[in-house]
Curated annotation (Swiss-Prot):
It is found in: Mitochondrion intermembrane space. A motif (Cx10C motif) lies at residues 5-16. The keyword Disulfide bond applies. Belongs to the CMC4 family. InterPro entries: CMC4 (IPR027179), Cys_alpha_HP_mot_SF (IPR009069). It comes from the Eukaryota. This is Cx9C motif-containing protein 4, mitochondrial. Signal peptide: none annotated. GO terms for cellular component: mitochondrial intermembrane space. The twin Cx9C motifs are involved in the recognition by the mitochondrial disulfide relay system. It comes from Saccharomyces cerevisiae (strain JAY291). Disulfide bonds join 5-37, 16-27.
């Protein structure tokens, strides 16, 4: 697995942000999908695993809490 969650990360920058003139509020659902993917990645591979597409586990946990997301959301 070379870059877990790359599809979700690219959807944010490559499509959503460009389409909405970099207004991240309009991309909330796509950003949530990335965070959920990253949460699953860390759950499956351990918190010492890394992906250039995912924030570090401690930051991811904070972001998910701020957005009221749980790892089982989809």
């Amino acid at each position: 697995m070379s870059n877990p969650c790359q599809k979700e990360a690219c959807a944010i920058q490559g499509y959503c942000l460009l389409s909405h003139q970099y207004d991240d509020a309009k991309c909330a659902k796509v950003i949530d999908q990335l965070y959920i993917c990253c949460s699953k990645f860390y759950k499956d591979n351990g918190k010492d695993s890394r992906s250039p597409c995912c924030p570090l586990p401690s930051l991811l946990e904070l972001k998910m809490k701020q957005r009221k997301l749980t790892p089982g959301d989809s």
